[in-house]
Every structure is written in structure tokens, then in C-alpha cells.
């Protein structure tokens, strides 16, 4: 159910960018994983191992976003508008 929700966005990004190592592609993948895990926590609030994994993914995504913000602010703003996420925590 949730898995099918995120696949179209990934396939859309794959068509636009053929490079799975690009910062935008990695951020999209991390964002999809984060959304899946947050929906998982609604059913399993005491799954502490998954919470640890979520914190690691959040840190990696934050690092990639700060890198992208330093390198190319226009690409960063475009990505944030596509993902509908807030950028208040980016350093």
C-alpha cells in the first residue's frame, strides 16, 4: 500500500536524471525511506531499532542537503519545492 505510493516519484526522477549517484536522487530516496518509516511508527511506536535507523537516515539526508545548499542554491530550492519539505534544519 505505502510502497506503491512512492514508486511513481522515484521513476519520474530516474527518467529525468540517469545518475543514481546524484545528490538529488539520493535525497529523494532518503525522503521516501523516511516517509515509509514514519508511517511504520504509527503502527509500531516502540520499534527503537527502526527509530535509530531513521535518525541515521535523517543525518545523511541533512548532510546531503547542506552540501547541495552550499554548492548550488537553485537546485536545492527546486528539490525542496518538489519534495514539499521544510528546510529550517539545514545548516
Swiss-Prot record:
Protein name per Swiss-Prot or TrEMBL: Small ribosomal subunit protein uS15c
GO cellular component, one term: ribonucleoprotein complex
Gene Ontology BP annotations: translation
GO molecular function: structural constituent of ribosome
Source organism of the structure: Cicer arietinum (Chickpea)
Alphabetized Pfam families for the sequence: Ribosomal_S15 (PF00312)
InterPro entries assigned: Ribosomal_uS15 (IPR000589), Ribosomal_uS15_bac-type (IPR005290), uS15_NS1_RNA-bd_sf (IPR009068)
Family: Belongs to the universal ribosomal protein uS15 family.
Keyword Membrane recorded: no
